[in-house]
Design a protein with these regions (language model features):
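Charged, glycine-rich intrinsically disordered N-terminal tails and low-complexity linkers that flank
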Residues: 1-75, 79
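Nucleic-acid nuclease catalytic cores
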Residues: 62, 80-105, 109-171
Length: 171
């Protein structure tokens, strides 16, 4: 059975004062429109700390995705204990006085021997991997930008690798 990982509380608490990878679609929408549509107001109010959302719901599909993610982490960690689950990766470059940018990649490996940082974003979905990549491209972009910054802060000779892990829930 998958071990329970206590990262959800940290992810929820970081919603105030920060935009994250899951806000990528919202940021792309704002950039594309050239203004902030009303559909983004609630998330931005949470980010600014002027609105608190108490009812974070979890659907059956979300719970299944978390379970699968934890099982994949268990497999990775059993092969290499350096794997981390959902660490907080906070940008220094894209932080200003009143808002920051961060991500919690599902799995992270910092390989000192090979000088490679690997981020893996895991998606449990009933879509194909191509559709999943297209649906989550904005989140992957933010994780890529933050991953490159994180890697450059470790050292110039280091390389960064972002992977999409896909589990099709249709069987």
């Amino acid at each position: 059975m998958a071990e329970e990982y206590n990262y959800k509380d940290e992810i929820l608490s970081s919603r105030v004062g920060f935009l994250g990878g899951s806000d990528g679609a919202m940021l792309a929408k704002i950039a594309g429109l050239g203004y902030v549509p009303t559909s983004c107001n609630e998330r931005l109010a949470i980010c600014k700390g002027i609105y608190t959302k108490e009812d974070y719901f979890v659907t059956e599909a979300m719970a299944l995705g978390d379970k699968i993610e934890n099982q994949i982490y268990d497999m990775l960690h059993s092969q290499d204990e350096r794997w981390q689950s959902n660490p907080r990766i906070e940008s220094k470059k894209y932080k200003c006085k009143n808002v920051g940018l961060l991500a919690h990649p599902d799995f992270v490996l910092v390989d000192e021997d090979k000088k490679i940082v690997t981020f893996i974003e895991c998606k449990a979905t009933n879509k194909t991997i191509k559709e999943a990549r297209r649906n989550y491209i904005n989140q992957l972009y933010i994780e890529s930008v933050l991953g490159k910054e994180y890697t450059n802060n470790i050292g110039k000779a280091w390389k960064f690798n972002l992977k999409l892990c896909h589990y099709n829930t249709d069987g």
